[in-house]
């Protein structure tokens, strides 16, 4: 029986490779940080991790994780509603609610689960979900699992969003779903205008803060802080796997009744093991650190501005950003692959993105800055970009 399936899969995999879309996994032999070593012994500077605040190898978080294992064990061996809820889980949910100024929080194994398990428990065929065209795959999948009527508006296009809201007026409930920061371009959702339209057309607002929490806003509290939208957003989702330590774990935070219903009906929550105590303990310590100082956020923003200013001065085409994501536009798919390969030879680890990950003709190198980067790291990366850019005719 597997013979036919094997033949089919082999052809599919060959087609993926022929199209240049096969994903190879590079093996890292050090902790995740700005300077890493890969399994061939090569030392490289990492500019493609979501380690925005540089906390992935923070010793204070490592110590907190070890302490949590000593006091609360290695794993939970249960879902939350049976015997998988410890005092640490409730403490972390309270800390997340405090951070986002919300009423309650529910933890998930990943933000993919948070988004995947959000819509189906809350909305039916009587309702409407209005989603940004560039939302993350987890939001798209979550919407697909729900029977609500679906609308999609062009990225951050408020006229198109208003058109969708007008068309959805006959539905019982409406919710606008958007990423806070869009991961390929690094642009920030215009949350103030989204909230204005939501209030005008009686819609709820959901924001995924995965790439924006810890990064965007005067003190890094996300797009809600950036646009002073506290109290206007009904649901936030997010991850502990990016700025907040980089391990794993996701969450949904918002109105109390919404969170309570998710505890009753959200399938990824009901049928997945609780997040491990080590992750919870380290995450609690991380939120304490962010309360004590916003120095890491300040350093991150300084690094972003330093990198962008010098890359623009060198002649590169970079999309506008208010986040830690800098999209260096190359437009040609093969050029983006060649550029990334040459950067690796210069000791800089970046990734080229091209269709179907981004639209045709929009290939780019996505650079992700971190508070873990020092000025010497940035200078080396900029010098490599300039060298490779000249070799490939991207800049003069």
Can you say where each PLM-predicted feature lies in the sequence?
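PLP-dependent enzyme catalytic core of the Aspartate aminotransferase-like
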Residues: 59, 63-67, 71, 94, ...
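Conserved PLP-binding catalytic core of the aspartate aminotransferase-like
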Residues: 298-307, 312-347, 357, 361-362, ...
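Conserved PLP-anchoring active-site segment centered on the Schiff-base-forming lysine
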Residues: 118-137
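Active-site C-terminal subdomain of aminotransferase-like
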Residues: 201-204, 211, 216-322, 335
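Short loop-beta-helix segment that forms the pyridoxal 5′-phosphate
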Residues: 79-85, 94-117
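Active-site phosphate-binding strand-loop segment of PLP-dependent enzymes
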Residues: 51, 151, 155-207
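N-terminal "arm"/small-domain region of PLP-dependent enzymes with the aminotransferase-like
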Residues: 10-11, 15-72, 203
């Amino acid at each position: 029986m597997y013979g036919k399936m094997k033949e089919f899969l082999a052809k599919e995999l060959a087609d993926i490779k022929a199209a240049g879309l096969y994903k190879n996994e590079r093996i890292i032999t050090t902790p995740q940080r700005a300077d890493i070593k890969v399994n061939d012994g090569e030392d490289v500077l990492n500019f493609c991790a979501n380690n925005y605040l540089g906390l992935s190898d923070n010793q204070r978080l490592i110590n907190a994780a070890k302490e949590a294992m000593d006091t609360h064990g290695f794993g939970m061996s249960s879902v939350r509603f049976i015997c998988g809820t410890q005092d640490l889980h409730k403490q972390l949910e309270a800390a997340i609610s405090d951070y986002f100024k919300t009423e309650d929080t529910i933890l998930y194994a990943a933000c993919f689960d948070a988004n995947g398990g959000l819509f189906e428990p809350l909305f039916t065929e009587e309702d409407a979900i209005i989603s940004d065209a560039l939302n993350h795959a987890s939001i798209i999948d979550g919407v697909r699992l729900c029977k609500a009527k679906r609308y999609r508006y062009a990225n951050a296009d408020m006229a198109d969003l208003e058109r969708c809201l007008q068309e959805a007026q006959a539905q019982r409930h409406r919710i606008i779903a958007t990423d806070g920061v869009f991961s390929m371009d690094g642009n920030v959702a215009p949350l103030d205008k989204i909230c204005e339209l939501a209030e005008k057309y009686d819609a709820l607002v959901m924001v995924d803060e995965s790439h924006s929490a810890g990064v965007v806003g005067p003190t890094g509290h996300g797009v809600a802080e950036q646009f002073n939208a506290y109290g206007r957003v009904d649901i936030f989702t997010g991850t502990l796997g990016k700025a907040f330590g980089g391990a794993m774990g996701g969450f949904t935070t918002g109105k109390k009744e919404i969170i309570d219903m998710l505890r009753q009906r959200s399938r990824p929550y009901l049928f997945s093991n609780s997040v491990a105590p080590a992750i919870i303990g380290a995450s609690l310590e991380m939120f304490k650190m962010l309360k004590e100082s916003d120095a890491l956020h300040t350093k991150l923003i300084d690094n972003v501005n330093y990198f962008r200013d010098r890359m623009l001065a060198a002649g590169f085409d970079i999309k506008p950003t208010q986040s830690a994501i800098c999209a260096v536009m190359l437009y040609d798919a093969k050029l983006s692959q060649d550029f990334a390969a040459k950067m690796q030879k210069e000791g800089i680890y970046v990734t080229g993105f091209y269709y179907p990950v981004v639209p045709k003709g929009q290939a780019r190198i996505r650079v992700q800055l971190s508070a873990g980067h020092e000025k010497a790291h940035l200078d080396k990366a900029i010098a490599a970009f300039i060298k490779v850019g000249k070799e490939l005719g991207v800049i003069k």
